[in-house]
Amino acid sequence: MSKPKYPFEKRLEVVNHYFTTDDGYRIISARFGVPRTQVRTWVALYEKHGEKGLIPKPKGVSADPELRIKVVKAVIEQHMSLNQAAAHFMLAGSGSVARWLKVYEERGEAGLRALKIGTKRNIAISVDPEKAASALELSKDRRIEDLERQVRFLETRLMYLKKLKALAHPTKK
């Protein structure tokens, strides 16, 4: 598992600063180098769950399917915002909630239950030298064609500009 972007201590420092000063989200965001929406999320988590809400969640761990359904239904039935739902259910952010809503709208509860979040995709990258060489050659050919087309365009443009200049300033014989 990777290290969280913002450690617990920094989150707590930001939230404490919010409650002990009159500074708004924008000023705190600039002072601590944290996005304003992140400050807002941490404040909401702290208000709802205390310091426990600020503990970073491990990355790559997928949420329980029943929790996903509960969150989506709360957003729809209780008219919660994505940020409110994330804070209420102690989720890392509203991005997951938005993704779950989209899946729910497209495939319903079954789609949320079947959703595999946090699984790594296995993308096979071909390292065939012949294919790589032919792809490089093809890209060079395309680049040459594009440059030739651009040269023709610029030459034509220059010709029209010269013709326009000649018509605008006729020489006397």
From Swiss-Prot:
Gene3D superfamilies: Winged helix-like DNA-binding domain superfamily/Winged helix DNA-binding domain. InterPro entries: InsJ-like_HTH, IS150/IS1296_orfA-like, Trp_repressor/repl_initiator, WH-like_DNA-bd_sf. Pfam families: HTH_28. One of its GO terms (molecular function) is sequence-specific DNA binding. Belongs to the IS150/IS1296 orfA family. Coiled coil: none annotated. It comes from Escherichia coli (strain K12). The gene is insJ. The keyword Ribosomal protein does not apply. The lineage of its organism: Bacteria, Pseudomonadati, Pseudomonadota, Gammaproteobacteria, Enterobacterales. This is Insertion element IS150 protein InsJ. Keywords: Transposable element.
